[in-house]
Amino acid sequence: MVNKRIETLLAQLRQQGIQDERLLKAIEAVPRERFVDEAFEHKAYENTALPIGSGQTISQPYMVAKMTELLSLTPVSRVLEIGTGSGYQTAILAHLVQHVCSVERIKGLQWQAKRRLKQLDLHNVSTRHGDGWQGWASRGPFDAIIVTAAPPEIPRALLEQLDEGGVMVLPVGEQSQILQVVQRHAGEFIIQTVEAVRFVPLVKGELA
C-alpha cells in the first residue's frame, strides 16, 4: 500500500517537472509517514503540506523536491538548512550529500527531528538549536543553503555564509511570498525569481 502511494507521488512529481533521478530516489527512500503525527499518516504521501505542531508544517513534497533540485547538489556539497522542522527535508538532503548542517529555533522540533534521523540511521547530519537568521557561521561557508520558512528579506548572515559559486534557495516576503534562487558569483549576488509560494514566517531568535 505504501509502495503504491510512493509510486503515485513520484509520478506526480515527474509530471510537475522534477527530473533529478538522484533526488527522486531519495524521496522514494525516505518514509514520509515517519515525519508526521500519527493522525496524519494516511496523508503522508499526498502532495500537500501537513501540520507538525508549534505552528509549523512539513512542506508539500513538490516544494521539497523543487527547492532541493534548485540547489544543484553534488555529493560533496556543503549544505546548510534553516528550519529543521520535522526533519523530512533534512533526511532528503542527507541522502544526497556527505553532510548536512541544520538549524531549528524550536527546541522540541529539533529534538524530535534528531531522534527521527537517528532511527533512520542518517548519521551525516548535525542539528543545532538556534536562530536561523544567524545561520551557522562556524560550519561555513556553504555551497548550498536552503531556507524552509520565509523571511521578509534575505538575511545578511546567510548571504555572508554562502561560498563563492554557491546557491541559496528560499521563500521571501510576508503576505505575498516569492521563491528565490540566490547565486554568489565574483562577490556579487544574482537573484532569480522562481514562483509564488506560501510558507510559515522565519522568526528571529530561538524558542526553548
Curated annotation (Swiss-Prot):
PROSITE patterns tied to this protein: PCMT (PS01279)
Coiled-coil intervals, chain numbering: none
Active site: 59
Purpose: Catalyzes the methyl esterification of L-isoaspartyl residues in peptides and proteins that result from spontaneous decomposition of normal L-aspartyl and L-asparaginyl residues. It plays a role in the repair and/or degradation of damaged proteins.
UniProt family annotation: Belongs to the methyltransferase superfamily. L-isoaspartyl/D-aspartyl protein methyltransferase family.
HAMAP family: PIMT
Protein name: Protein-L-isoaspartate O-methyltransferase
Gene of this entry: pcm
